């Protein structure tokens, strides 16, 4: 919702196309700079599991989009820029951790069809995008952060119930 409908939402909030492009670019660049440090931290034996890190990132993302929705009419351009930019950064930070969670689960011998999962994710994105388009056309662009809240809660529930255990033996063996 946040990336696919960034222009729709931000144009309605008074941003120019140039500002929207810069905001999304900066959000993605900040994420790209932070990803190696977070990945390095996640690989340490004493670090929380990828699942726990995803839950934490998702909670931060949820707070950001709730703040965005709650201040939709009252906030300044600066506040909207910071909230939307941070939301984009968090969203982009979570993607490699989702992939890592799947790959580590497979490596641990659990049955997981990654291709089917990716395909289902694409179909779900298409349906969610279509539905959000209909909602936005009917109720306005303020539906976008509300939809993002709903998707974040759904993602939080899915990750919370994902059966993952951090493989500390592998991490300790790599340390030696």
Spans of model-derived segments:
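Glycine-rich segments within core transmembrane alpha-helices of 12-TM secondary carriers
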Residues: 30-32, 112-133
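Structural signature of the two symmetry-related core transmembrane helices
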Residues: 51-67, 149
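Paired intracellular helix-loop junctions of major facilitator superfamily
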Residues: 102-113
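Hydrophobic core of transmembrane alpha-helices in multi-pass small-molecule transporters
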Residues: 64-67, 71, 75-97, 101
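Symmetry-related core transmembrane helices of the 12-TM Major Facilitator Superfamily/SLC fold
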Residues: 144-161
